[in-house]
Amino acid sequence: MNKIESRHQLILSLIMEKKIHTQQELQELLEVNGVSVTQSTLSRDIKMLNLVKVNEDDSSHYVINPIAPTRWEKRLRLYMEDALVMLKPIQHQVVLKTLPGLANSFGSILDAMEIPQIVATVCGDDVCLIICEDVEGAQACFEHLKQFTPPFFFSKL
């Protein structure tokens, strides 16, 4: 584990152990544990770890955001907004058509997301074939992927 990963693990364990109200308090706890960090680095760490402040009993403290999208979900949403041409379930598969040259990027993102219904992705230049175990799995996968498309994508003209 490298230095950044170790620091992130320590931050997460500190957040889970006790209520930390300020960045300065977190910075001091890191110091006690032998990790010296600047405020700007700590601020970036907080953002990377999806930590948010919640209000409770007239004070606020840091928690891990339970509904924060993963970086792969963010990336998929961006790709869907910029490069998706078609998304359609067909039997036990979902066909994802993209702008030329981007199908492999979609396939890599989908593989990294480890969506349970996806058995495999096979990609060409502008088509990513998403293979599922059965028709129900393909429909569930399609419904899951639809949530990453722009709001207007499936609207009727």
UniProtKB/Swiss-Prot annotation:
Q: A GO BP term, please? A: protein complex oligomerization
Q: Does the keyword Transcription regulation apply?
A: yes
Sorted keywords for this record are:
Activator, Arginine metabolism, Cytoplasm, DNA-binding, Transcription, Transcription regulation
Citing just one GO molecular function, the answer is:
DNA binding
Location in the cell reads: Cytoplasm
What is any one of the record's Gene Ontology cellular component terms? cytoplasm
Gene3D superfamilies listed in its UniProt record: 3.30.1360.40, Winged helix-like DNA-binding domain superfamily/Winged helix DNA-binding domain
Which pathway, metabolic or otherwise, does it act in? Answer: Amino-acid degradation; L-arginine degradation via ADI pathway
* Entry keyword Transcription: yes
What protein family does this chain belong to? Belongs to the ArgR family.
This chain's function reads:
In the presence of arginine, coactivates the transcription of the arcABDC operon, with other regulatory proteins such as ArcR and CcpA.
The entry's protein name is Arginine regulator
